[in-house]
Amino acid sequence: EVDMIVRGSHLMSQIMPEAISHNLETKLQESGVNLIFNSEVKEMNKSENGYVLKTDQGEAYNAQLVLAAIGILPNIALAKKAKVETNIGICIDENCQTNIEDVYAIGDCAEADGVVQAYLEPIRRQVKALASHTYGDSTERFKVLPTLIKTKTPSLSIMLSPPLHATHGQWELNMNVGESQRLHYTVDGEVSGFALSGEFVTSANKLYKELL
């Protein structure tokens, strides 16, 4: 028996459209997962049989094993002490350089154009930009782009490229065949992101290239 405590109103609410989230939720529930939405763990204590988790809704759950999948937050404490410019993360330019000469940042802690991208693809491009700049070559420069994300959910294949700034647009269902869905995120009629599930994930790379 598995209880999954979810802070939002649906799974991966920050990057995934509700339509695909709901299909994934159905698949997980069919597998015996109990989903608890709009709830957040505030306290965890050891018990004789494992752990007791208490939520902000006043609920308590007993568990033998606890797995935290709550994301990451850049640790900028050291950078602040060193007078490096920070915001959400450590601020970098197109060469991955900070405001201090010869001090660089890449990876989960780096912020470019107000965005922290804690994914493998942008980190790989940051490494190329940093290496290029170090060797005096300016051909490789880091640019914040939408990233392609593959979720590791065996019950439902999902690939998506969420918009960088999801504030003025909306998710629209583009195609629906059985359990497979394709949604586009549009802003003033222009596609700036997509989400695919089921059989449609095979077209992810093609759509991603078109998006860029």
Describe the role of every protein-language-model region.
Residues 200-212:
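A short, polar/charged loop-to-alpha-helix boundary motif
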Residues 43-49:
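Feature captures the FAD/FMN-dependent oxidoreductase FAD-binding
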Residues 47, 99, 187-188:
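Structural motif
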Residues 109-203:
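Mid-to-C-terminal Rossmann-like scaffold of FAD/NAD(P)H-dependent oxidoreductases
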Residues 52-54, 60-132:
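FAD-site-proximal beta/loop scaffold in flavoenzymes
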Residues 1-43, 123, 141-150:
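Rossmann-like dinucleotide-binding cores of NAD(P)H-dependent redox enzymes
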